Regions:
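Catalytic pocket-lining loop regions of alpha/beta-barrel enzymes
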Residues: 1-107
Length: 107
């Protein structure tokens, strides 16, 4: 199953008062955050425990943000004693894929 950078809705994402060019640049950059939300919800929902052979891919959202997100998930898992069968990094390794897009630093 895949999710794209446009998943998650667009309402209230950019500040008002911007001209169209600034708004499009801002929105196009922020859209990556929607995939972050999807991954966090996927990891903490318990869905990956219930369906251990179902795979997911984050499409056209790059990969540079993934290490930070997984580190934050690991931290919150420990802070909140979330009852998961695996660690967030283990779920990612087992069931989640991501695609490069425009970044070069992570290649």
């Amino acid at each position: 199953m895949n999710f794209h950078i446009g998943s998650g809705g667009l309402g209230g994402i950019v500040w008002g008062g911007m001209d169209l060019t600034r708004m499009l640049a801002s929105l196009s950059t922020i859209l990556f955050m929607n995939n972050m939300r999807c991954l966090v919800n996927l990891i903490f929902s318990g869905l990956l425990d219930r369906f251990p052979t179902l795979n997911f891919v984050s499409v056209e959202s790059g990969i540079g943000w993934i290490p930070f997100l997984l580190e934050a998930c690991e931290y919150q898992l420990d802070e909140n004693a979330v009852p998961l069968e695996l660690r967030p990094r283990e779920y990612f390794a087992r069931q989640i894929y991501a695609s490069f897009w425009l970044e070069r630093a992570d290649v």
